[in-house]
A protein has these predicted regions:
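N-terminal glycine/serine-rich phosphate-binding loop of ATP-dependent small-molecule kinases
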Residues: 1-97, 109, 125, 151-154, ...
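Gly/Ser/Thr-rich active-site cleft segment
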Residues: 10-12, 123-232
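Short glycine-enriched loops at secondary-structure junctions
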Residues: 23, 81-82, 105, 162-163, ...
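Short alpha-helical segments and helix-capping/turn motifs at coil-helix boundaries
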Residues: 61-65, 142-150, 236-238
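Glycine-rich phosphate-binding loop of actin/hexokinase-like ATP-binding domains
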Residues: 85-114, 154, 158-191, 220-260
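Structured, active/binding-site neighborhoods that engage oxygen-rich ligands
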Residues: 118
Length: 260
């Protein structure tokens, strides 16, 4: 009988997982710290494999603590740090570089290059975002240039949600949702995925991108016989939780930084 729900919170400083029963009681909680590296001032990177292993460890810990069985889990919800960028080889499953974290400024020179090309107004019109190192597209470009990669045929890109689902499905599913895609500089908000102008500017092929999926979708996990229930990023999920539905209301998250 499917009687449990798991929530995964993959954040900047830690990975957490919570097991709930049908009455929304918390049966078990697990958390593991995530390490950040700082190769240069303003640069922030993480080991994408460590992120995955910490998630797997947290899930295993829930079952050990609660006595629940994987086949009793009805669904898994995922919330994650956005913008953080992973590029990996789809044949080996290995990242080609550390994940570049959302707050990293290491793509500043690339951003300035594109601003000088005069593409920022059009990109803002198409994506709703300004050109800034914060967002994922320039992080992808930085990784490819750092590794001197011209052919991206065997490569995949994902934010952390995409990376975790891809790992959970043994490479069978490469997807993301609107809440994550909207922070990549690659989502055309007028007709959704993808922003061709920036793909061309960054010399990226659309084959590297995950499929933009509806928020309600079912996946059969290879490691757990359950479905991945709608994942959403922390900020937007908190707005729903606190009934922030009008322009007069707002919600602020203050960990690990302040998000409005």
């Amino acid at each position: 009988m499917k009687k449990y729900i798991i929530s995964i919170d993959q954040g900047t400083t830690s990975t957490r997982a919570i097991l709930f029963d049908q009455q929304q009681n918390i049966l078990a909680v697990s958390q593991e710290e995530i390490h950040n590296s700082f190769p240069q001032p303003g640069w922030v990177e993480q080991d994408a494999n460590e992120i995955w292993l910490s998630t797997l460890s947290c899930l295993s810990s829930l079952f050990l603590k609660s006595g629940a069985q994987p086949d009793e889990v009805a669904s898994i919800g995922i919330t994650n740090q956005r913008e953080t960028t992973v590029v990996w080889n789809k044949k080996t499953g290995m990242p080609i570089h550390n994940a570049i974290v959302w707050q990293s400024r290491q793509t500043a020179a690339i951003v300035e290059r594109y601003k000088k090309m005069g593409v920022e107004p059009l990109i803002k019109e198409k994506t709703g975002l300004v050109l800034d190192p914060y967002f994922s597209a320039t992080k992808i470009r930085w990784i490819l240039e750092e590794k001197n990669i011209q052919n991206t045929e065997d490569l995949l890109f994902g934010t952390i949600d995409t990376w975790l689902v891809w790992k959970m499905t043994n490479g069978k599913v490469h997807v993301t949702d609107v809440t994550n895609a909207s922070r990549t500089l690659l989502l055309n908000i007028q007709n959704y995925w993808n922003c061709l102008i920036f793909l061309k500017t960054c010399f990226l092929k659309s084959s590297i991108l995950p499929v933009l999926s509806a928020i309600l979708i079912r996946f059969i996990f290879s490691i757990l016989p359950v479905r991945s229930e709608p994942w959403s990023v922390i900020n937007k999920a908190l707005c729903l939780d606190n009934l922030v539905f009008t322009k007069e209301k707002s919600k602020t998250l203050t960990e690990p930084a302040a998000f409005y």
